Amino acid sequence: MPMTEVLVVGAGPVGLALAADLRARGVDVALVERRTEVGAGTRAIGIHSPALALLEASGATDGILERAVRIARGEARADGRLLAAIRFDRLRARHPYVAALPQSDTIEVLTALAPPVRRGVTVESLRQEADGVRVGVAGADDLRAKVVVVASGWAGRSLVYRDGAVRTHHYPDRYVMADVTAPGGPVARVHLEREGVVESFPLPGGRRRLVAWAGREEVPDAAAFLHQAVARRTGVEIDTTGASSFGVRRAVAPALRRGRVIVVGDAAHEVSPIGGQGMNLGLLDALTLAPLLTPWARGGDGDGVDRWERDRLASARHAARLAFLNTLLGRASGPRAHAARSAALRTALRGPGGALFTQAYAMRLDRAASGT
């Protein structure tokens, strides 16, 4: 049975980015995906500067930037007034902005650079052997690889972790979301209002991603709720169709490595999407792992992978804490608490803390950001 150097399980943005990077390094890499078709929609939309820099190795950055809106400025607002501006264009980085584009576009760019995806392949088991990993596949012959990377989202955790090993905290908060045609230009805006947050991020083609806090109960009519919430909280009337509601949860795995099996992305950690760091966290997992896998898959001892694991776990915990802070700030509040929150944010963001805040939200504090 032939043995692949690296097998990547999962062809979402994280798995594709890893496979494309490894392919550019000349690694024999295979990519399998249980879904028979590419998922539609614009789930994660923002790619931060550290990930953009690391995507250069595979050639993906140029293709992404050709399709993206570059967000150089963000605004925190409350009660119709500007609390503070967030200046990504002042970052000391190769890419001092956030690249915003539909996730489907990101996947198209990465797919063109990655090896062909073998779709309809459901991985059922991973068994360590002396010189690699045997991969059990539903209804097909086993596969073998020197190293296996699980990048298949939360559904892939059972391949690596026992039940209960990855503790998951479900937040009570509900949100509604839609991509709409709306004014606003290439500026990201976060409206921190008494009734809850509204996030408004630019997308190509004059569209925007809108996300609104919706309390703690299921929303029966997401489109109607979002229309009313945006009008009340921001004063902007929009036409919302195709809105959806979602909840948030937090999980960080205790380890990212089991012998020759590595776990990256949502399979290893989930953070609230409020703040837009989840996909980037996975991309940074993959893109910092790639240069370590190349020698390991060719007979090396995996030197550096343990350090990589420690760094990525630390970054995941940091991102989870920041996402929790975003969730707290986005909840509804009474008049006094709202006034106090607005005053505190205005003071913090316009003072020395503003630069640190910008670094944190641009993921410049992630351990993978050094040198990017």
Model-assigned labels for residue ranges:
Residues 13-20, 24, 246-325:
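Conserved mid-domain beta->alpha element of the FAD-binding
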Residues 147-248:
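Conserved FAD-binding catalytic core of PHBH/FMO-like flavoproteins
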Residues 138-147:
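Core beta-strand elements of the Rossmann-like FAD/NAD(P) dinucleotide-binding domain
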Residues 23-43:
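Glycine-rich FAD pyrophosphate-binding loop
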Residues 119-133:
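A conserved short coil-to-beta-strand element within the FAD-binding core of flavoproteins
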Residues 2-14:
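Beta1/beta-strand and adjacent pyrophosphate-binding region of the FAD-binding site
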Residues 43, 47-109:
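Active-site-adjacent segment of FAD-dependent monooxygenases/related oxidoreductases
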Residues 3, 231, 292-372:
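C-terminal helical "tail/cap" subdomain of flavin- and related membrane-associated enzymes
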